[in-house]
C-alpha cells in the first residue's frame, strides 16, 4: 500500500519542495509519502472534534491552519531518522499489523528447521524411518570442520559425508509403511506489532506570547511546538539505537552466543593490550579491524542473510580505525550527506564495505583513563526494507492538539505520535526461535547485531 505510485504522486509537491532537503532514496520517499497520508487522515478526523481554543462554529479552520506546519515537520523529520540506516522501516496503515515468517522443516511442521544450517547430505538418502540406504549409519554426515581431517591424515574420522541411494533402493521406496519417502514441510508463523504512543504538552500565557513577540519577534506557540516535536523525534531515534545496543548478541565470542571467548581474554571484550599484537598503536588498531571482520563473519553464519555491513561506535573507536588507515572519512564530505548532529553521525566507509556511524551521546569523557570502556556494534541491514534485525513501524508520526484552560483561559498545546517496534521473527538466539507479539527481543538475543566492549585503546 505504501509503495503506491498514486500516493507518491499526490505528495510529490511536498517531497520535492525546493526549500526542503531532497529525498533521493526511493524507499524513503515511499515511506514518507505513506506517513504524510496517515497524517492527513488523522488531521481530517480531528477536524470534527470540539476545540476549546475557538468557538464551536470555527473548529475546522482552527485545526486546519496547522496542517502545513505539521506536514512540513513530518517531511523534514521522517527521512532523517536513524532507523533508515540501521534497521528496517515498515509504515503501518492501521493501529496493528502482522509479520509473517515461513520456515522450512524436516519431516513435519513441528520438525527441525531446514535450509538454515548446513544441508544434511544423508537426509534424502534415507527413508522416513531414518534408515540409511548407503550402508552407513543413520547419521552418516558428521563433523562441521574439514580441518579435522588433517589431524589424522589418511582417515575421515570426525568428518564424513552421506551419499545417494542405489537405484534398487530408490525403486523400493514406498512399498511398505516402514519404507516411505523422507518428507519435508513448512510452517507459517506470525508475530504482531501494535502501535504505541508518546505524548508531550506545553502551556504558556497570553502575556508571555505578547512579550516574546514584542521583544524577540518569536511566536511562543511555534517555538514550543518545535521543542515538543523535536524531543519526541529525538526520543524515537534514541529508542532505536538503545534497543539495538540492548538486544545485540555479545561479540568477540563464539558463534553460538554462549559467551565463550574465542582468542580474546574475555568474552565480549577486546583488549588492545592483550588481544591485539603490534609494535605501536596503528598495528594494534589493525587488530581491532580484524575483530570487526570476525564479528561480521559471525553475523553471516548466524543469520544466513549476509555479512555485517554497518557499525555504530564511540568516537574513539572510529578514530582508531581511521588512524589505522581503513576508515575513509571523505564520503561524508563528497556526498553532501545530511548529518544529524542530534541523532546519528555518518563518519564514513570502513574498508569499502562498512558504513560507520558515531553515537554522539556515547560516554567518552574517560577515554584515556585506566579501564576506560569504548565499544562498537556491528550489524547487518540488507538492501530490502524487510531484511533487517529490527523494524520501526511508524503509524501517525505527529498529531497536535490545542486547547484553552477552563479556569485560566491560557492556551495549551500537546503532541502525540504513534508507532510500533518489533524484531525480525528470525532474529531469535537459536535456530527455530521466534519473536513473540510486540517484542523487540530479550537482552543479547538479536543475531543481526553484535556488541563488543573495547578497552585500553590508548
Region locations from a protein language model:
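Assembly/oligomerization interface modules of large self-assembling protein complexes
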Residues: 89, 98-195
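Surface-exposed intrinsically disordered loops and tails
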Residues: 157, 251-277, 428-439
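Extended assembly-interface regions of large multimeric machines
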Residues: 1-127
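Short, intrinsically disordered N-terminal pre-domain segments
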Residues: 1-19, 247-248, 260-264, 327-329, ...
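Short, glycine/acidic-rich hinge or "gate" loops at secondary-structure transitions
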Residues: 220-221, 236-262
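Extracellular/periplasmic catalytic domains that process cell-envelope and extracellular macromolecules
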Residues: 92-95, 194-196, 303-305
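Sequence/fold signature of self-assembling virion shell proteins
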Residues: 77, 83-85, 164, 168-178, ...
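Short linear, low-complexity motifs centered on an aromatic residue
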Residues: 108-126, 246-250, 426-440
Amino acid at each position: 500500500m505504501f509503495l503506491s505510485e498514486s500516493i507518491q504522486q499526490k505528495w510529490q509537491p511536498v517531497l520535492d519542495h525546493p526549500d526542503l532537503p531532497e529525498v533521493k532514496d526511493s524507499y524513503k520517499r515511499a515511506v514518507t509519502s505513506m506517513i504524510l497520508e496517515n497524517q492527513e487522515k488523522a488531521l481530517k478526523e480531528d477536524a470534527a472534534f470540539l476545540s476549546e481554543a475557538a468557538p464551536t462554529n470555527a473548529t475546522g479552520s482552527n485545526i486546519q491552519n496547522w496542517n502545513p506546519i505539521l506536514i512540513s515537520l513530518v517531511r523534514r523529520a521522517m527521512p532523517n531518522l536513524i532507523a533508515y540506516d540501521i534497521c528496517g522501516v515498515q509504515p503501518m496503515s492501521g493501529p496493528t499489523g502482522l509479520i509473517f515468517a515461513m520456515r522450512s522443516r524436516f519431516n513435519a511442521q513441528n520438525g527441525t528447521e531446514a535450509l538454515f544450517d548446513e544441508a544434511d547430505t544423508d537426509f534424502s538418502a534415507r527413508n522416513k524411518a531414518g534408515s540409511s540406504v548407503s550402508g552407513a549409519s543413520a547419521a552418516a554426515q558428521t563433523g562441521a570442520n574439514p580441518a579435522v581431517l588433517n589431524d589424522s591424515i589418511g582417515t575421515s574420522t570426525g568428518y564424513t559425508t552421506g551419499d545417494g541411494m542405489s537405484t534398487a533402493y530408490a525403486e523400493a521406496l514406498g512399498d511398505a509403511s516402514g519404507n516411505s519417502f523422507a518428507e519435508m514441510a513448512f510452517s507459517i508463523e506470525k508475530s504482531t506489532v501494535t502501535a504505541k504512543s508518546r505524548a508531550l504538552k506545553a502551556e504558556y500565557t497570553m502575556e508571555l506570547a505578547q512579550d516574546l513577540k514584542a521583544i524577540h519577534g518569536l511566536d511562543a506557540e511555534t517555538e514550543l511546538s518545535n521543542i515538543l516535536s523535536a524531543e519526541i523525534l529525538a526520543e524515537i531515534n534514541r529508542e532505536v539505537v538503545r534497543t539495538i545496543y540492548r538486544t545485540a548478541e555479545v561479540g568477540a565470542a563464539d558463534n553460538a552466543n554462549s559467551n565463550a571467548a574465542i582468542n580474546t581474554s574475555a568474552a565480549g571484550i577486546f583488549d588492545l593490550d592483550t588481544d591485539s599484537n603490534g609494535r605501536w598503536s596503528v598495528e594494534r588498531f589493525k587488530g581491532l579491524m580484524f575483530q570487526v571482520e570476525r564479528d561480521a563473519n559471525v553475523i553471516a553464519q548466524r543469520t544466513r542473510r549476509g555479512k555485517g555491513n554497518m557499525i555504530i561506535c564511540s568516537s574513539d573507536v572510529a578514530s582508531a580505525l581511521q588512524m589505522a588507515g581503513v576508515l575513509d572519512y571523505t564520503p561524508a564530505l563528497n556526498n553532501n550527506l545530511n548529518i544529524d548532529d542530534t541523532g546519528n553521525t555518518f563518519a564514513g566507509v570502513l574498508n569499502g564495505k562498512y558504513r560507520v556511524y558515531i553515537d554522539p551521546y556515547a560516554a567518552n569523557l574517560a577515554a584515556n583513563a585506566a579501564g576506560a570502556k569504548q565499544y562498537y556494534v556491528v550489524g547487518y541491514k540488507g538492501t530490502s526494507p524487510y531484511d533487517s534485525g529490527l523494524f520501526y513501524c511508524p503509524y501517525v508520526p505527529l498529531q497536535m492538539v490545542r486547547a484553552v484552560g477552563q479556569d485560566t483561559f491560557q492556551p495549551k498545546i500537546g503532541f502525540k505520535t504513534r508507532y510500533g517496534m518489533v524484531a525480525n521473527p528470525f532474529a531469535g538466539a537459536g535456530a527455530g526461535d521466534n519473536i513473540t507479539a510486540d517484542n523487540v527481543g530479550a537482552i543479547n538475543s538479536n543475531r543481526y547485531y553484535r556488541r563488543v566492549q573495547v578497552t585500553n585503546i590508548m
